[in-house]
């Protein structure tokens, strides 16, 4: 009897798992403030896209320690745009420092330049050239969001501060709207 119950339970678990595995569009954002959900207004602009839209993130592998946790947050949000774009949005993530040709194109064609950031630890202090930029491209039109557009620094006490994303969905959608309107 126990053996039959265990076998039936396993078969049911496997069956449910296979059934749920086919449901790829089920997405639930349980974060505080729904930081990975895209608003209806953003979805409206994404539905206006007729040609492929490129969202390219330029992020350095080596950056300031306070900036590092923001990179995955931006990448996750950009992935949400790709999903909401229903095949009309192509995303790329590039570290220009690792590829000289890509860095040259970013600098010359799009005006994307690294930001010098001071990093220090217990034993040394150094300047790191870091990329934290988003390129929105539509046809021949493009818009670049840089460090100043995406990041907000908040004071915490006299000497401490916090670096957070300002309002990334608004900034990305505003840039998409701008390139869509300029393209027309």
Label every PLM stretch briefly.
Residues 1-184:
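Short, surface-exposed patches at the edges or C-terminal ends of soluble domains, predominantly
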